[in-house]
Structures are given as C-alpha cells and as structure tokens.
Amino acid sequence: MPQLATICYIDNGKELLMLHRNKKPNDVHEGKWIGVGGKLERGETPQECAAREILEETGLKAKPVLKGVITFPEFTPDLDWYTYVFKVTEFEGDLIDCNEGTLEWVPYDEVLSKPTWEGDHTFVEWLLEDKPFFSAKFVYDGDKLLDTQVDFYE
C-alpha cells in the first residue's frame, strides 16, 4: 500500500530549519532531526501539501521547490512511502511552536552531525550541493539503511 508524503528543508542561506522530533508519542521519527512535512491530503498536490505542512508546523509562508522523490519500501508496516523532497529558500513569517517537536536553525556544518535517519545524510547533502532533480530508493530494516539507489536528471 502506498503512502504519499512531503519532506521540506528550509534554507536561510547559512542554516537549515530542522525539526527535532521529541513531542509525539509512538513516533517512528522519535529523537531524530528531520525536515518538516507530512502526508498528502485527498485532492492535494505535493506542492500544496508542502506549503500547508510548512505553515502548520513552522508558521512560515513558503515557496517550496521540488528537488526529488524518494521511495522508502515498507518504511512502516505494510506501507511503501513515496516522499516528495522540497527545498525552500523563499519564505516569510515568524516561527511558531510545533506540536511535533522543537524547531531549530542548524548551521550547514552541523546538520549531518545531528541524530537523523542514515539516508537523510545522503539526500540532505544533495540539497546543500544543489544536485539536479533526483529519483531515489532507500531501503531500511528498522533504523538500519540496507540499500540506496539514485538517478539524477539534468
């Protein structure tokens, strides 16, 4: 069964806005630092979902730009996650408290030292290096990354 979702990394030119997932009980992302995002709602485009999730979780009005798509086979029981990856450099507003965790601006050189999903290191580097649009697959067994495949499109 497929689950469609977005993940968004907001970039202020020297830092990424990261979400430390430390507030939701029974959270598959508990304790990890990730971008903001969430599941697509019925009738919603990935772009609309990304903008809505950014506003709901951060209070920022943003213009997300699609940078890639990642497939996570059986990331949660019986669900393959298809995640649209966005980068944001145009945004306005003030941060709000997020009910899913703590928001923090993290300098580029500290992003990869935060506890995160192993595969996130890979695609966050692609975002920071401004790699071309990508289609990737990250295969996990629990927290362990087993396999990565990627195609870049010029």
Curated annotation (Swiss-Prot):
Keyword field contains GTP-binding: no
Residues covered by the Nudix hydrolase domain: 1-129
Needed co-factor(s): Mg(2+)
Catalytically driven reaction(s): 8-oxo-dGTP + H2O = 8-oxo-dGMP + diphosphate + H(+)
Keyword annotations of the record: DNA damage, DNA repair, DNA replication, Hydrolase, Magnesium, Metal-binding, Mutator protein
GO CC terms in record: cytoplasm
The keyword Ligase is annotated on this UniProt entry: no
Gene Ontology process terms (BP): DNA repair; DNA replication
One function term, GO molecular function aspect: metal ion binding
InterPro entries: Mutator_MutX_prot, Nudix_hydrolase, NUDIX_hydrolase-like_dom_sf, NUDIX_hydrolase_CS, NUDIX_hydrolase_dom
Catalytic activity, EC: 3.6.1.55
Signal peptide: none
EC class name: hydrolase
Binding residues for Mg(2+): G38, E53, E56, E57
Motif (Nudix box): 38-59
A Pfam family reported for this protein in Swiss-Prot or TrEMBL: NUDIX
PROSITE patterns, sorted: NUDIX (PS51462), NUDIX_BOX (PS00893)
Function description: Involved in the DNA repair system to avoid A.T to G.C transversions. Degrades 8-oxo-dGTP to the monophosphate, but is also active on all of the nucleoside triphosphates.
Known partners and oligomeric status: Homotrimer.
Family: Belongs to the Nudix hydrolase family.
Name of protein: 8-oxo-dGTP diphosphatase
Lineage of the species this protein comes from: Bacteria, Bacillati, Bacillota, Bacilli, Lactobacillales
Gene name in the database record: mutX
